Each structure stands twice: as C-alpha cells, then as structure tokens.
C-alpha cells in the first residue's frame, strides 16, 4: 500500500512505513556487450522480471565471457555468469590451467546453452604443413596469430593447449625469427591469416561467416588433431575433441578433429538462493524458444546458438548443477511442460 501526497503541485507516491522493499537486482555477467552472451543474459533478465511477483530487475555487467566471469562469481561481484567454452568451467572449479592456485569455490551450473564450436589451427597451404607435428618441425620463421594469453583469456589458453599437444613451441618459433600476435576477438586471428598477416592461426567461432570467407578466399589447410594429440588434451586438462565434418568449410574434403570449444555455461555458486536457481532453470525448461527464435534465420549448424534449447541436454554440464536447479529439472521430467 502507498500513500499519495502533494508537493509543489506534483503527485508523489510514497510507500507506507514498513512496506516491503524490492529485492536487489539479479546481477548477470556476460560478454563485451554486443555478442551472444549479453543477448542470453537479456533473455533471462526479462524472464525474471516477468515471473516474479515484485517484477525483480536485473543488472547485466559486461565482461569477456571467459575466466573473468567465473572469477566474478567467486568474489561475489555477480550472482550468475555466462562463460564459454563450458568445459573450461571445470578447470575453474578444480583450480587448474588458467585457474591454477586460484580455484573458484562453490561453483555450480544452472545449464549449458547449445553452441557447437571448436578451436582449430589453420595454416597457409603453400607451406606444405599438414599436421601440428609438421608445424613443430618447420625450420623457418612463422607468423602465428591466436587469442590473448592472460589468466582470464580462454581463447589464448585453448590455442596454447592445442599447439602444445602437437609439440609446437611458440618460444622456439620466435627464436627462429617468427612472431606471435595475440587478439581479444577470435575474428582478428582469422583475418590475420586471410589478409596475409599470419602463416598460422588458431581460433574459434567456426560457425561464423568469417571462417567461410577464409576457406573460400585463401588456400588454407585445416590441421586435424591426431589421436595422440587428443589424448594429451584429455590427459592433461580433461578436455575433449569434436569432429568437424567434411564440407563444413568450402573445400574441406576430410573431417577435422579439433579441441571442443562448445556451449555457453550459465554458472553460479551454491550461495544463489534456491528460488532464483529454480526460476532460471524454469526458463531453460519452458522458454528456450523465446531466445532460440532470434537465431532461427540461420541454419542450425552455422548458428551461434545451435537451437533448439532442450533442458534434457542443457542440464548436462561440466559442473555439478545447483541443487535447486537439479530439482526443477527432475520435476520437469515427471510433469509434461508446455514450452514456448
């Protein structure tokens, strides 16, 4: 209940003493602001607003969508955060790789949204390099382009892990007169190779037009991981590979095995209240199509969101589920749900 008063001719709505206060905004952390994770956070923020009696607001903080987002959960800066690839979240929970000595305590998941992606090394075909072993043995200088190498830079860590699995020593490349260029955005590495500034690049976001343009406009070779190299990634980091089918890129005649860089994990901590965790899980169960329809103009295999969103697969994440989210999914299994 509110009282209405007058002040200098203006009507003022005043809450009565003791009236309940609106809850604090739900704090999301997403990506730089113009990409998919911010879009996903906006979808969930609207769901929260529309499905809380007090129309709870949200704050969407921009980030990198990588290790910084998961660390923000650990420090209590935000309540929920998206990060990609989903598999790297396990490294955060375990304090390994880019999180060595700095694990994120209590890290759990609400869901993982479907995003089919890979971290792929690509080289100029005229160099005659067909494998990472060839790259490691190449005696001349090479210009290499890949993601930023810092504690929060998943693209840099992923690129390094791929090259190291094949025995490629970036320091040795520099010693031979080569260069290593690092970028924040995956497309910059792709552009370096396409525009002749690099001989080898390692990058992701393979479903985007930039990769199609690279394959169509340059004579390049996609380097497939060997079974031994895949075993190194699995044994050292617990990371899996994914197969890119022949024909996915123009001129790709054989499948390519690459580091799996898939899915957008929606992470939180065990401190997130149960009702909030259940509400977010309910969005995954009931409202996925509201978000997915924004991508359906693209073929599913070339869409950043590999629609549809099915909670039965979305709940299978690299992290344990928040207990309340897990209960919500279990209830959905028992009761048929009308999805949007």
Task: Identify the meaning behind each predicted range.
Residues 45-46, 60-101, 187-193, 205-216:
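Pocket-flanking alpha-helical
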Residues 85, 123, 127, 167-273:
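Pocket-lining segment of extracytoplasmic ligand-binding domains
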Residues 23, 75, 105, 116-118, ...:
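Extracytoplasmic
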Residues 134-161, 241-307:
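Ligand-binding clefts/hinges and TM-proximal coupling segments of bilobed small-molecule sensing domains
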Residues 100-119, 249-258:
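A structural signal for short loop-to-beta-strand junctions that line the ligand-binding cleft
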Residues 20-51, 55-60, 117-191, 195, ...:
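Bilobed "Venus flytrap"/periplasmic-binding protein-like clamshell domains
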Residues 205-207, 213-214, 275, 279-340:
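An extracytoplasmic/periplasmic, membrane-proximal ligand-sensing/linker region
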Residues 1-23:
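Short, low-complexity disordered leader/linker segments with a strong preference
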């Amino acid at each position: 209940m509110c009282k209405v008063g007058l002040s200098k001719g203006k009507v003022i709505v005043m809450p009565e003493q003791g009236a309940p206060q609106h809850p604090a905004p739900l704090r999301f952390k997403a990506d730089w602001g113009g990409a998919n994770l911010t879009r996903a956070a906006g979808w969930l923020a609207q769901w929260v607003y529309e499905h809380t009696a007090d129309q709870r607001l949200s704050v969407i903080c921009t980030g990198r969508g990588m290790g910084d987002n998961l660390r923000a959960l650990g420090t209590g800066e935000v309540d929920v955060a998206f990060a990609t690839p989903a598999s790297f979240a396990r490294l955060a929970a375990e304090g390994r790789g880019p999180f060595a000595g700095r694990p994120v305590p209590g890290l759990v998941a609400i869901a993982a949204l479907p995003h089919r992606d890979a971290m792929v090394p690509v080289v100029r075909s005229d160099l005659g390099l067909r494998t990472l072993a060839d790259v490691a043995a190449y005696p001349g200088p090479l210009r290499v382009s890949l993601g930023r190498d810092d504690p929060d830079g998943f693209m840099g860590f992923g690129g390094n892990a791929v090259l190291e699995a094949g025995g490629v020593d970036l320091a040795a490349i520099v010693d031979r007169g080569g260069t290593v260029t690092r970028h924040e955005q995956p497309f910059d590495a792709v552009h370096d190779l396409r525009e002749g500034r690099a001989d080898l690049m390692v990058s992701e976001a393979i479903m985007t037009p930039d990769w199609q343009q690279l394959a169509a406009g340059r004579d390049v070779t996609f380097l497939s991981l060997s079974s031994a190299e895949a075993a190194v990634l699995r044994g050292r980091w617990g990371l899996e590979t994914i197969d890119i089918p022949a024909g996915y890129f123009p001129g790709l005649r054989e499948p390519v095995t690459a580091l799996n860089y898939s899915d957008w994990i929606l992470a939180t901590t065990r401190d997130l209240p149960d009702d909030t965790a259940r509400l977010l899980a309910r969005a995954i169960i009931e409202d996925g199509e509201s978000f997915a329809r924004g991508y359906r103009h693209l073929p599913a295999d070339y869409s950043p969101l590999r629609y549809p969103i099915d909670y039965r697969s979305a709940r299978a994440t690299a992290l344990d589920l928040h207990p309340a989210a897990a209960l919500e999914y279990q209830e959905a299994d028992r009761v048929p749900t009308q999805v949007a």
